[in-house]
Amino acid sequence: MLGVTYKGVAFPLLFTMLDKRGNSNWKERTRLIDRFIQLFGAECIDSLVADREFVGKEWVEYLNNRRIRYYLRIKQNFWLRNPKSCQDVRAWHLFHGLKLGRERVYDKLFLLKGEYVYISGALLKNSDGVPKLQILICYNRPEEAVATYKQRWQIETCFRAMKSSGFNIEDTHLRDIDRIARLTAMVCIALAWAYLVGEHKDINVKAIRILKHGKRAKSLIKYGLEEIANVLLRPLYKPKFDVFKFLSCT
C-alpha cells in the first residue's frame, strides 16, 4: 500500500493485493511506484519512507536510479562498507555511544549491498518507552532523515483506523482476494470521507476534547465516522451540516 501523509494520517492512494503471506518483494513495490508515477508524475514525490521490511539491493538501486528521495530504516546488523578503506562494519557500530534523544549523521557515502547510501540514526524510545536505535539510509539530504522518517507513524494511524479503531475491516473475514480488494478500495474512500467530516465538525461544530497529555480524546476519522453513522442509521438525528457534500470534488 502506498499513501500520502497529511495532518497526522497517511491516506492510501494505491495498493496491490498479494496472494501470499509476508511482505512484498522489490518487483511488486517498483510496480506500485511506477503506477503512481504514471498517474501523478515523479515530481509529486517529496520523499518515500518505509520500515525495515522494505530494504533490499534491487529496491534501493531502483530508487537511486529513479532519483526518488527516500528514507528507509535498516536492521542494526546490516553490513556497511566504507568505499575508501574497503572496511566492513555493522550498522550499529557507527552509532556506538550515541545518547538517548540524540542523532548522528554521516556526510560520507557507504556501500550497502553494492549501493551507495548515506547513513543517519538516532536513539529514541519506542511506544513502550524502551530506547531503540533507529538507523536510516537515504539517497540525499541525510540531515533530514530522522525528522522526515517520523512521518512514518502516520501509516499506523491509517491502519488503526481501517482495523480496530474505526472500520474493523478484518471482522469481515473475507478470503476471496478480489472481494478483499474491492472492500479495501471502498474503505480507502470512506476513510478520506470520515476524516473530512470529522475535521469539519471539529472546527465548525464542536471541538474534540483534548486530554491531559495533549492528544485528542478520539481521532478525526472516528469523529467523522460517528457523524456519518448517525446520519445514516438514526432517522431522527438532525445534523448541523451536510456530510454528503464532502463526497463531491466541487
Language-model segments: what does each one mean?
Residues M1-G3:
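Short beta-strand scaffold segments in enzyme catalytic cores
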